[in-house]
UniProtKB/Swiss-Prot annotation:
The family this protein is said to belong to: Belongs to the TmcA family.
UniProt cross-references to HAMAP family, sorted A to Z: tRNA_acetyltr_TmcA
Cited InterPro entries: Acyl_CoA_acyltransferase, GNAT_dom, NAT10/TcmA_helicase, P-loop_NTPase, TmcA/NAT10/Kre33, TmcA_N, tRNA_acetyltr_TmcA
An MF annotation (GO) of this entry: rRNA binding
Coiled coil feature spans: none
SUPFAM superfamilies registered for this protein in UniProt: Acyl-CoA N-acyltransferases (Nat), P-loop containing nucleoside triphosphate hydrolases
Catalysed transformations (reactions): cytidine(34) in elongator tRNA(Met) + acetyl-CoA + ATP + H2O = N(4)-acetylcytidine(34) in elongator tRNA(Met) + ADP + phosphate + CoA + H(+); a cytidine in RNA + acetyl-CoA + ATP + H2O = an N(4)-acetylcytidine in RNA + ADP + phosphate + CoA + H(+); a cytidine in tRNA + acetyl-CoA + ATP + H2O = an N(4)-acetylcytidine in tRNA + ADP + phosphate + CoA + H(+); a cytidine in mRNA + acetyl-CoA + ATP + H2O = an N(4)-acetylcytidine in mRNA + ADP + phosphate + CoA + H(+)
Protein name (database record): tRNA(Met) cytidine acetyltransferase TmcA
């Protein structure tokens, strides 16, 4: 079906009155005709210094909205949209009174509302852009004139459906490429100033506007087109969606299959039908915008209504409730299509719970969801959740894991690399991959532009057998890349560098790239093979060297931007002099996923420490989510643990650990003392603040690179000593001598390298039963032993420790 794409006569006359050239109207008509015909998006960049750009956006968007509104019935029939309302989104950095962002919005709205009064206009600030996740818009106006973050850019652009237009408001490119934005101001940290902040990311963004198809550029101050289409057009052919055939022998209601827009979604429903009568696990992967969450929302209702149970409870979890809004909305829609009355519970505008007769669907944070009883568990955006927590869901009878491969969620393939490999060892599962976009057709140029500018689809370099030989021989070198060259000339090395993070890390946000590009204290290091291939990527932040006046403020509670390690040392160890010292904080370190466990990470750290030493720095440190593997990695590389956060990260479920490798003599003195203090604190925290800390993590936190015992006197009364002897001789039980055993166990963990040898299981037993005071049943389960065996083993360990340490323990008179 061919349709006319021409501005109505009244809008053309209005535009001329407002001095809008016909060429700009033709440009908009052409962009819209291209978008409709291909079911893609098109972008028009309006660069300028005055309110003209907002006025022009209002007039052109108003005309486009009127054209789209004429063809809503045909688009609904072809399933190109699911609403009769034309929806327009205006996104900006600020909407407060007297802000420039507000003035531009008001100028836009004045013209737009006059020309397209029936369109629904939503305004949102970047800060609240998560509020529009799960919604879809026909037209987007995004104001980048002053402030934005790359995370916002990705999240907002992807809400526009095929056949839609995106208007981008910017400053004149020549001015913009040298401007500092609000995002830049947030990167300033002592001792740096705004003058030190780079502008690489904005320059990359400007360049990418001119490199990709489907993007047109207008200078609104001169009302001239600077990048125009090859051919103007005023007609479009309404496309047809791929015909989706409903399979025979379906078990979910047919009405649910009719909600599917792609064959991939049908496959998801068909796969989940297998969970009606038997337990099982399904893994769903897709790029952003492929209808993954929608499919799960529909299929979860299919399972609930097909179940023989009177009550069907569904637990939904994801890193953030925003991640599951599409799932919840389509679960609600599916229930209503089947004739159910629904009850929805929201929090801050986000759907948290959906109920119908006998069916309950509820969102829980990752650390709480697995504790609930349910018939089905759904883990959405699983790559953003800490692997040990994913393993808790792995134990459930019916569970669905889903993960975005590329997109602003930034999952990467780390989910497959780190979790699914281990999951295969525990249970069988079916995997479904969705490749066809839902909001727009394949090959959308705006998606290509977005993935390119934000490096969402970056991949590491491929490794050959010759490369592995170089790795085995450790023929590598550490290099500081020229970031100006990487970003200005769009080097492949940048994609390979970021690609390592995309594949190796659980979450990789677009703003991480901007931080690397522009933050004055952030730098990159790469471990290259002799042939130049990047195999390990390191992002570092230079910290310390803080002026005395700022340090005094820090000691009173002030938190400077950046400087995470100096700030922690000042507040938790009263080491004000440490903040004057300079060091590298390793922000991220990751090795090529095809070359893991070959010693590259340790080699990269070794060379980084050597570089820091040569540059006269005082320390190298890092902060990270504590897992047994990571703690072990850092400790084995000679780093001392100096801090553990009192609470777990609500998304990852991990405690944050901070480690430091001192280089200068002054740093060694301070860090040694901080490490000793931390170990003393940990012996107490394990029974209180960190009672739920995994013992396999705790045991590595006690390890020290200094090898010396902590000078921390342990006292036992004469009676306690006698009772301890009676426990060893099996006269008294453990529960009656806890007060005497605990100081002895503390002494062991505060000892140096000369402490008696205990194997891994024995160390875990001391931590779990004595320091964390868990009962015999839990401890025996942890160790995979009987309770009786565990009791006997603890007595044997205490006997050995007592004979080894009793000459060091003072009694109340101070005698040994």
């Amino acid at each position: 079906m061919t349709v006319k794409v021409k501005f109505p006569k009244d809008i053309r006359e209005y535009a001329r009155k407002e001095k809008v050239k016909d060429s700009l109207i033709k440009l908009t008509e052409t962009a819209l005709a291209e978008a409709i015909s291909k079911f893609h998006r098109r972008m028009i960049v309006l660069q300028g210094d005055t309110l003209n750009k907002a006025k022009l956006a209002g007039i052109l968007a108003g005309g486009a909205a009127r054209i789209l509104s004429e063809y809503i019935p045909e688009m609904l029939e072809r399933k190109l949209r699911d609403t009769e309302q034309i929806e327009v989104l205006y996104a900006t950095d600020a909407l407060g009174e007297d802000t420039y962002g507000r003035k531009r919005f008001e100028e836009f709205r004045k013209h737009f509302s006059l020309l397209a009064p029936t369109a629904e206009l939503t305004s949102v600030t970047f800060k609240h852009s998560r509020d529009i996740l799960g919604r879809t818009f026909d037209i987007l106006v995004i104001d980048l004139s002053y402030d934005y973050s790359p995370n916002d850019l990705g999240r907002i652009i992807e809400t526009v459906r095929g056949g839609g237009l995106i208007f981008v408001l910017t400053n004149p490119f020549e001015k913009w490429k040298d401007m500092w934005t609000g995002f830049h101001k947030s990167l300033v940290t002592p001792p740096y100033t705004i003058e030190d902040v780079k502008k690489r990311f904005n320059r990359r963004l400007i360049r990418k506007f001119t490199e990709h198809k489907g993007i047109y550029i207008v200078n609104t101050d001169r009302m001239s087109i600077e990048r125009k289409p090859g051919k103007y057009r005023s007609q479009a052919t309404l496309p047809e969606r791929e015909k989706v055939e409903i399979p025979k022998n379906i078990r979910f209601p047919r009405e649910l299959y009719e909600l599917c827009l792609t064959r991939g979604q049908v496959e998801v429903l068909k796969t989940l039908e297998e969970l009606i009568e038997k337990e099982g696990m399904v893994v769903l992967t897709a790029d952003r915008g492929r209808g993954k969450s929608v499919s799960i929302g529909i299929a979860s209702v299919g399972l609930a209504v097909s179940s023989k149970k009177k009550r069907f409870r569904i637990v939904v979890t994801a890193p953030e409730p925003e991640n599951v809004q599409s799932l919840m909305k389509f679960a609600k829609k599916s229930l209503e299509v089947l004739g159910y009355k629904t009850k929805v519970i929201t929090d801050n505008g986000l759907i948290k719970e959906v109920y119908a007769k006998g069916i309950g669907i509820r969102y829980y944070p990752p650390t709480k969801g697995y504790r609930q009883r349910a018939e089905l568990y759904i883990v959405d955006e699983a790559a953003g959740i800490h692997v040990p927590i994913l393993h808790r869901y792995l134990e459930k009878e019916r569970v669905v894991f889903s993960s975005t491969i590329h997109g602003y969620e930034g999952a990467g393939r780390g989910f497959s690399v780190k979790f699914l490999k281990k999951a295969k060892e525990k249970r069988e599962y079916k995997e479904v991959h969705l490749s066809t976009p839902i909001r727009y057709a394949e090959g959308d140029p705006i998606e290509k532009w977005l993935f390119d500018v934000l490096l969402l689809d970056a991949e590491p370099v491929e490794l050959t057998e010759e490369d592995y030989e170089l790795i085995r021989k450790m023929e590598v070198y550490l290099e500081e890349p020229d970031l100006d060259d990487w970003f200005e000339n769009d080097r492949e090395d940048l994609r390979h560098f970021v690609g390592i993070y995309v594949l190796a890390h659980y979450r990789n946000r677009p703003s991480d790239v901007a931080l690397l590009a522009d933050a004055p204290h952030h730098e990159a290091r790469v471990l290259r093979l002799k042939n130049g291939k990047i195999v390990t990527a390191i992002q570092i932040a230079k910290e310390g060297g803080i002026p005395k006046a700022v340090i005094d403020k820090m000691a009173k509670g002030y938190k400077p931007p950046g400087n995470i390690i100096p700030d922690m040392m000042v507040k938790h160890h009263y080491a004000k002099e440490f903040a004057r010292l300079k060091g590298y904080r390793v922000v991220r370190i990751a090795t090529h996923p095809d070359a893991m466990d070959m010693g590259l990470g340790s080699k990269a750290l070794e060379l980084l420490i050597k570089e820091a030493e040569e540059k006269g720095l005082d320390w190298v440190g890092s902060g990270f989510g504590a897992s047994p593997e990571l703690i072990r990695f850092w400790v084995r590389n000679g780093f001392a643990v100096v801090h553990l956060s009192p609470t777990r990260n609500p998304v990852s479920g991990e405690y944050t650990a901070i480690v430091i490798k001192p280089i200068s003599e002054k740093a060694k003195e301070i860090v040694k003392k901080a490490n000793e203090e931390f170990r003393i604190r940990l012996t107490e925290w394990l029974g209180d603040t960190h009672r739920d800390l995994e013992p396999e993590i705790a045991r590595w936190l006690f390890e020290s690179p200094f090898g010396e015992a902590v000078n921390y006197p342990i006292y036992l009364t004469k009676t306690q000593k006698r009772r301890l002897e009676m426990f060893i001789k099996r006269i008294l039980t453990y529960d009656t001598v806890v007060d005497a055993v605990k100081p002895l166990v503390k002494l062991y963990f505060l000892d140096g390298w000369m402490r008696p040898y205990l194997d891994e299981r024995q160390i875990m037993l001391l931590i779990h039963r004595v320091l964390q005071a868990h009962d015999w049943k839990e401890t025996a389960k942890l160790l995979n032993r009987t309770e009786m065996y565990t009791m006997v083993e603890l007595r044997d360990i205490v006997r050995g420790l007592w004979y080894y340490y009793k000459h060091l323990i003072k009694d109340e008179e101070g005698e040994k």
